[in-house]
Regions:
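Bacterial N-terminal signal peptides that target proteins for export
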Residues: 1-11
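Bacterial N-terminal signal peptides
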Residues: 9-19
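Compositionally biased, proline/threonine/alanine/serine-rich low-complexity intrinsically disordered stretches
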Residues: 22-46
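Low-complexity, repeat-rich tail regions
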Residues: 25-30, 145-149, 155-292
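Mature N-terminal segment immediately following signal peptide/propeptide cleavage
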Residues: 43-66
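Short hydrophobic alpha-helical segments that form membrane-spanning helices or hydrophobic packing faces
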Residues: 66-72, 191
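Mature extracellular/secreted ectodomains of secretory-pathway proteins
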Residues: 70, 74-178
């Protein structure tokens, strides 16, 4: 074979190799560096005066209802659906309502389900989602400060003559910063209605302070012991919310993993469920103290 032939063959082989290389896909890009892990967003912190304004609409709730409201507010995303369900079933009470909750297999947190007998409270929370989320965030991040704010507002209402024992609840003063509001009958809870602009300010001359707080009908909670109503209280001096004698300990840090301290037992026997799914106008359940 001549030298010319060999050179020509080499050139052809080189051209073929270059063509193959040109048609080959480019190598994949290098993997990106591992994402940097950032700490969770810091908890929003409120000043005492802001906390006073935040809790004023619920500060005079009796302790058991206040405890359920504060813990339920930390699940603010569940409140609208719970309020809608409670409104649709507001014709049920006691064991009938408890049975409906079980039969509908509701997936709310127990603290939210504990408020289902109180459609007016849930409606107030659902109608003001910004307030509810702010309250829940404060409870998660600043529970001691939230409880102190409640005590400051209760002290104001006492000083101005609005908060005192009556037929619905007993006001018990255990010491500074320890004002308890307890139902007269533990099986029934009365929701107080009041205007914060009135009860937390000095009364006007000639104003009858006894008209500053009114009450709706008593709500029977005996059928809702599984949802914490059998034993819920505050340790005001230790800044604890106690459910079934165990501290409720959900915080801003563990809010994604915390499990309620009690489990819901099997449904208690009761009568047949009444079906009458009639949605009532939401305005019927607006708390009076929310209308300023």
């Amino acid at each position: 074979m001549s030298t010319t032939t060999l050179l020509r063959a080499g050139m052809i082989a080189g051209i073929v190799s270059m063509t193959i290389l040109a048609q080959a896909p480019p190598p994949p890009p290098p993997p990106p560096p591992p994402a940097q892990e950032y700490p969770p967003a810091p908890a929003p912190m409120l000043a005492p005066q802001q906390l006073d304004q935040l809790v004023e609409r619920v500060a005079l709730y009796p302790d058991p209802l206040l405890g359920q409201t504060l813990t339920a507010s930390t699940y603010w995303n569940e409140i609208p659906d719970a309020a809608a369900w409670a409104n649709q079933h507001n014709y049920l009470q006691g064991d009938q309502l408890s049975r409906a909750i079980y039969e509908d297999n509701l997936n709310f947190d127990p603290s939210v389900m504990a408020l289902l007998p109180f459609p007016g409270v849930l409606d107030m929370m659902a109608r003001d989602p910004g307030w509810t989320q702010a309250l829940g965030s404060a409870v998660l991040a600043q529970r001691p400060e939230v409880m102190d704010a409640v005590q400051r507002m209760r002290q104001k209402a006492m000083d101005y003559g609005y908060l005192e024992s009556n037929a619905q609840y007993r006001v018990v003063v255990e010491g500074p910063g320890d004002i308890e509001i307890l139902p007269v009958n533990a099986g029934y809870v009365y929701v107080p209605y009041y205007n914060p602009l009135i009860v937390f300010a000095p009364p006007r001359p000639g104003f009858f302070v006894g008209a500053g707080i009114t009450f709706g009908p008593g709500i029977y909670v005996g059928a809702f012991a599984p949802f914490g109503w059998s034993s819920i209280a505050f340790g005001w001096r230790t800044h604890e919310i106690l459910i079934d004698s165990r501290p409720w300990a959900r915080t801003w840090v563990n809010r994604g993993t915390y499990v309620h301290p009690y489990a819901i037992p099997a449904m208690r026997p009761g009568g047949a469920r009444v079906e009458r799914h009639v949605e009532r106008p939401a305005e019927r359940h607006v708390e009076r103290h929310d209308r300023r």
